[in-house]
Amino acid sequence: MVSVNKGEWDRSKGVEADYLFHQTWIAACNRKLRPGGTIWISGTYHSIYQCGYALQVEGMHVLNDIAWFKPNASPNLSCRMFTASHETLLWARTSKKDKHVFNYEAMKYGDFPKDIMKKPEKQMRSVWHIPLTKKSEKAFGRHPTQKPEALLERVVLASTNPGDLILDPFMGSGTTGVAALRHGRRFIGIEMDEAYLEGIARPRLQAELDLFRDIPATGQKPNTEAQLWHEIDGIMKAGK
């Protein structure tokens, strides 16, 4: 077991610079959200508290903090602290007064057979038992912080409706896009690392689109008009 070098983008530039970065991109996302639109942010203790504070400074209303429990998390290398076995997901809407989408019945009555925390026909709780990314989901290459499709599919199904537009400003390997396309949502992804964009995310999303072409007509046309790539002026660079 060795530590993972996640790249320059994952290195702290100091508390103040890190917070300014998070505040900047969260404010940029908030400007693009319609009233009642929501944002999901995932992270560990290294950054999630700064993000939570930035959401509140921006005037957004935090709906939930989700604990994603990883039953197969990697062991702690130093043996001097507890093994990190969860990440936090923050879910917030544009303001306290706005109405947001929450597909309550899909979460209560949906089928989540591998989540031992979810009891059949009971309300979905804020602790999610989801294993790390499957090997099959890394067929196009490895990304150091790739999230499992099951996690992003749950996020998409819980808080959006078919045809909604989802933006991921840190697309990485494209998992958010896969979840969006798979469930009939539109998608815009931004990724500053060309190796991940061209080597993993683009072919992975194209493969997901190709699946639609192999499905016989059922009277309900799948969403093949998803906007995969979008040029946005002034895309933020890490640390600016």
Language model features by range: what are they?
Residues 202-239:
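S-adenosyl-L-methionine
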Residues 1-199, 240:
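Core catalytic lobe of class I
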